[in-house]
Amino acid sequence: MGKVRGLRARVHQAAVRPKGEAAPGPAPPAPEATPPPASAAGKDWAFINTNIFARTKIDPSALVQKLELDVRSVTSVRRGEAGSSARSVPSIRRGAEAKTVLPKKEKMKLRREQWLQKIEAIKLAEQKHREERRRRATVVVGDLHPLRDALPELLGLEAGSRRQARSRESNKPRPSELSRMSAAQRQQLLEEERTRFQELLASPAYRASPLVAIGQTLARQMQLEDGGQL
């Protein structure tokens, strides 16, 4: 590219000068002034400007340093751990993705099943909504559908009653837990055992074979206690 000239330089011509007169230009550089003779203060300044480490002796072996793991700062260690964890996470994800890859037919089959389930759920919801609108439109005397929907299920009530009965039975002291019984309960237990023993002595099975009768009675009593605990 050429030199960019201003509008004045392009339109006006240069001034005519007489012979021997030089055209105006940049002024010649002024001759450097010679520094004055150095005094005592100048000598001190020159001494200060010289290399201050000229007489310093440094062992080259001290300049060689090794970056070891123990000498590294905590920040650098944390950065290294963060980088390694960040690099390991994508690899784990890639491994999980590689494990869950399914063939195209299986994907289409799963997608079709999901769509069928959604369609079935939508159909059931629409049918229920339609029945509710029909029930509201036609007033039926003795319609028990709202009451049936509001009441809890019978199975849930039965399960709750069974849990309450079991908790009550567990709260009652067993015959083996005499320390939890009161004096009246212990007296009642003794009366029951005495009555049961008298019935056993009066039974014909005891007269025929006492050991067999006692074993059968004890087994029956243990079964009753186990059933009460359950």
From Swiss-Prot:
Subcellular location: Nucleus, Nucleolus
InterPro entries per record: Slx9-like
GO cellular component: 90S preribosome; nucleolus; preribosome, small subunit precursor
Residues recorded with modification Phosphothreonine: 34
UniProt keyword list: Nucleus, Phosphoprotein
Disordered: annotated segments: 1-42, 155-187
Compositional bias annotation for Basic residues: 1-11
Function (record text): May be involved in ribosome biogenesis.
Family: Belongs to the SLX9 family.
Protein name: Ribosome biogenesis protein SLX9 homolog
Species whose genome carries this gene: Homo sapiens
The gene coding this protein: SLX9
